[in-house]
Design a protein with these regions (language model features):
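Transmembrane beta-strand segments that form the barrel wall of outer-membrane beta-barrel proteins
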Residues: 54-62, 85-95, 124-133, 140, ...
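Detector for outer-membrane/organellar transmembrane beta-barrel domains
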Residues: 143-218
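Short loop/turn motifs that connect adjacent beta-strands in outer-membrane beta-barrel proteins
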Residues: 46-51, 84, 119-124, 161-166, ...
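Residues that define the transmembrane beta-barrel architecture of outer-membrane proteins
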Residues: 50-52, 70-74, 106-110, 148-154, ...
Length: 271
């Protein structure tokens, strides 16, 4: 005969499984709704201008939000947009591959981002699916909130309506997926806030970045408020011919929280 404690434990386990299943259903629903929304845009506004963007960056190292990820990498981008709605696929992979026999060791990432911009308000809202399990990890299509290797993140970005002071601020929060607490039963809701200020000096485009973590977030190795990303980026296009220029960039990055610093060089190829 089952005791009340056993019955309670079984009930709790079933409840957790139900929650995990609901989380997986929610994520699948978001993906389906996004696809349907894009198809509806094409169907209802066939005459709307569709814009595609294809490009790739070759970088000396991959640093994400002030944190070193891996060495030299290729980072391709494929995106398309209809009016103010866009869908972007961005990825990164280094050159490690299967260097240790059959053991996969490459750093591999694929991020999918659905975004909508409100031009008159200067606002952009987006939802991203970030997957960086690496080469050979498999289970890409595991969307169970308890076992998935995906990180799902929502963001809100705002650009000040001041032409001479185009400061932007963005807030990112992971709301589902692998961003879990130590027990693995609750989301951490790790958040990151970033300010960017672009400007130009002669023919060089510059951008100053300051990124902070507002509260405890193991994802960023913080126990509370911390500055994790201070950077200065410079971009310049080298003229090769009258019809072709090669964009290059360098970025100096400091992470006060980790007491670390990086410098990255990159080349961009785009249509």
């Amino acid at each position: 005969m089952k005791t009340n404690k056993n019955i309670s434990a079984i009930a709790i386990m079933k409840k957790k499984q139900s929650i995990d299943k609901e989380g997986a259903r929610l994520i699948r629903a978001l993906i389906i709704i996004s696809i349907i929304g894009l198809l509806a845009m094409f169907t209802n506004k066939a005459s709307a201008q569709v814009r595609f963007n294809v490009q790739g960056d070759l970088v000396s190292s991959y640093v994400w939000r002030g944190m070193y990820q891996t060495g030299a990498s290729i980072q391709p981008t494929l995106s398309f947009s209809v009016e103010n709605l866009s869908l972007t696929a961005w990825g990164s992979t280094d050159f490690d591959g299967y260097r240790n026999g059959n053991i996969p060791s490459a750093n591999k990432e694929l991020d999918l981002t659905l975004a909508y911009t409100f031009p008159k308000l200067g606002l952009t809202v987006s939802v991203a699916d970030m997957w960086w399990a690496g080469q050979g990890a498999g289970k890409y299509f595991d969307f169970n909130n308890k076992t998935t290797a995906h990180h799902f993140e929502a963001s809100l970005a705002y650009v000040l309506p001041v032409e001479k002071f185009p400061l932007s601020i963005a807030w990112y929060t992971m709301f589902a997926g692998m961003d879990k607490n130590e027990k693995g039963d609750k989301n951490n809701y790790s958040s990151y806030v970033e300010l960017n200020y672009p400007f130009s000096v002669k023919s060089v485009d510059l951008n100053v970045t300051c990124g902070i973590v507002p509260y405890k977030a193991p994802q960023y190795y913080t126990n509370g408020f911390a500055v994790t990303n201070v950077a200065l980026k410079g971009s310049y296009a080298i003229k090769i011919t009258d019809s072709f220029s090669l964009p290059i960039f360098s970025q100096v990055i400091w992470n006060p929280r980790m007491e670390d610093a990086h410098i990255v060089f990159g080349i961009t190829l785009k249509q």
